Regions:
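Catalytic machinery of carbohydrate-active enzymes
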Residues: 2-355
Length: 355
């Protein structure tokens, strides 16, 4: 009824890592239908003057991509990286202030806005909107709601799925499939601009020649690993590398100071000292990134640095990509249950394979 299947079925034929049954077991069907029906009615009313587009044509040269609801850095990177398929068109971005900063100097996005009032509706012949959620539509309703639109996710509403592949396959579909699945699997990765200034700043850090980068701290309690000191101890004891660089946000400053005091000759910290993009350049200079699930894991995939990700409950396949050497370790109960031995063993394998 009304296309309810769209909430759990992808609009394209390619298969992506997605755990639909798990979502079904968690959320009863009546709740899922009521949520869909509410969004359906709101969308039909709010976008009644906006023609829904299922094919991006050559005439659609001026595009405003609106990415509003899922504004975490990792989600944003996964959702927007398929913009590489729109190169050659004028593409602007409307997103939240927090995420807008990482796209400065982008090779595809021309202008970046953080409020729909900044956008001139006469500048666009197509909107790409993230989804039909009410919050997303409210971000541009009014001056822009008469412009034809295409939706990335539409009504799709599943918790755990690989957003990056969804985005690439969906934009490829909207462009009438110029690329086959094998090509997309080979090239699909997060797209993150690293400017000449970012490179210059990081060059000034005089980083070691050969080092592992480790992200410490975390925003989410369930995604925060607390045994980095033990991991570092075993890495150094085994002689895997002699130098380790700590990165992350300022909330981990105290932890980084403790680790540096314990290993003053082997560990250096840039925790809380760099922008996201500058941190990505540090990762680019490393031979491996070790981290819990988070935005910097996607930065590693963007610069194609091998990555070992630690996950709580979430299957690594919904975050990792085929185009970069990445591996995940997961524990369903607690991320701290992932053994130090399994982490260090995988680090050895990833580095030996790289060499």
């Amino acid at each position: 009824m009304l296309g309810f299947y769209r909430t759990y079925t992808t609009p394209f034929e390619e298969k992506i890592p997605a755990f639909v049954d798990k979502f079904f077991s968690r959320v009863p069907i009546y709740k899922r239908f009521l949520r869909f029906f509410s969004r359906y009615v709101y969308t039909e009313i709010s976008l009644r003057n906006s023609k829904k587009i299922e094919t991006i044509l050559p005439k659609h040269k001026r595009i405003l991509w609106i990415q509003w609801v899922d504004a975490y850095l990792g989600d944003s990177l996964m959702d927007l990286s398929s913009r590489v398929f729109l190169s050659g068109r004028q593409v602007d971005l409307l997103t939240k202030e927090y995420t807008s900063r990482i796209y400065k100097g982008d090779t595809v996005f021309n202008r970046i806005f953080t409020n729909s009032d900044q956008c001139n509706p006469n500048d666009y012949d197509l909107l790409i909107i993230d989804s039909y959620r009410e919050r997303s539509i409210k971000s541009f309703i009014g001056r822009l709601s008469h412009i034809p639109h295409a939706s990335l996710f539409g009504y799709y509403n599943v918790d755990d799925f690989n957003r990056l592949y969804f985005s690439f396959y969906r934009i490829n579909q909207l462009l009438s499939h110029p690329y086959n699945k094998q090509y997309i699997d080979d090239i699909a990765k997060p797209l993150l601009p690293i400017t000449a200034l970012d490179i210059s700043v990081v060059e000034g850090f005089s980083l070691p020649d050969r080092f592992i980068a480790i992200v410490i701290g975390g925003v989410w309690k369930e995604r925060t690993f607390h045994k980095w000191t033990d991991v570092i101890k075993d890495i150094l004891f085994k002689g895997i590398v002699e130098k380790i660089v700590l990165i992350g946000s300022s909330d981990a400053k105290e932890e980084s100071n403790l680790i540096c005091r314990r290993y003053p000759n082997n560990v250096v910290s840039f925790v809380g000292e760099c922008t996201f993009n500058q941190t990505a350049q540090i990762i680019n200079k490393s031979i491996l990134l070790i981290c819990a699930d988070g935005g910097l894991m996607h930065a590693a995939n963007a610069v194609r640095t091998p990555v070992l990700g630690l996950f709580h409950e979430l299957d690594p396949s919904v975050r990792l990509v085929k185009s970069n050497r990445s591996f995940g370790l997961m524990d369903k109960l607690c991320i701290d249950n992932i053994s130090i031995k399994s982490i260090v063993t995988k680090v050895e394998c990833l580095i030996s394979d790289e060499e």
